[in-house]
């Protein structure tokens, strides 16, 4: 993805590394500026590693069955055309269940607009990527998160923290549907602090 000036935005987009700021960001639209739609989009992005285009194009029926959140969803990625089966963890299912109550209460979900995040202005369409970008950057700026934060930061944050907690990079590559480990390596946004941590901790658990 490129900006109007031709700058490669994808390569400069940063994950949210700091755990406390990540928690504040995650809950911003739940605790600070209530908006369950925005909250659910952020939770989905942080917990599924889906691209924002795939999140916005999710339909109600892909997520809910008999008014309940499904344990897995299966999508065909817009960018790659690859099929991806994704487990919805507890945090994600809880957010989606709460969001469904909001959809029903406000009648936001109506026949004729199948999308999970229906546009309030355009019939039969989801909200736009620019709307998602604005709400993500607004939350990040309010919280004071450093670095270039964009919609893609949700996906990169998933990868970074999966790697930090010890997940196999090969498994992360498969989750991302990347064609090579070198692409995944760039997504992890490993910094000097991360390397320093490895140097400090090596052999600490070895027997004396």
Where are these regions (language model features)?
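Conserved catalytic core of the tyrosine transesterase superfamily
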Residues: 1-208
């Amino acid at each position: 993805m490129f900006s109007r000036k031709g700058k490669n935005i994808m390569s400069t987009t940063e994950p949210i590394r700091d755990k406390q700021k990540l928690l504040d960001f995650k809950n911003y639209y739940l605790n600070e500026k209530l908006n369950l739609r925005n909250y659910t989009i952020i939770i989905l992005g942080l917990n599924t590693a889906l691209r924002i285009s795939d999140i916005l194009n999710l339909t109600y029926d892909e997520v809910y069955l008999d008014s309940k959140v499904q344990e897995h969803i299966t999508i065909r990625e817009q960018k790659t055309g690859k099929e991806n089966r994704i487990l919805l963890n507890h945090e994600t299912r809880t957010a989606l269940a709460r969001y469904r109550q909001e959809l029903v209460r406000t009648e936001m979900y109506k026949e004729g607009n199948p999308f999970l995040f229906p546009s309030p202005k355009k019939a039969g369409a989801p909200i736009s990527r620019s709307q998602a970008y604005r709400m993500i950057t607004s939350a990040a700026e309010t919280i004071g998160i450093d670095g270039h934060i964009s919609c893609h930061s949700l996906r990169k944050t998933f990868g970074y923290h999966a790697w930090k907690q010890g997940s196999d990079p090969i498994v992360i590559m498969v989750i991302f549907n990347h064609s090579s480990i070198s692409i995944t390596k760039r997504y992890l946004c490993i910094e000097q602090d991360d390397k320093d941590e490895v140097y400090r901790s090596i052999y600490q658990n070895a027997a004396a």
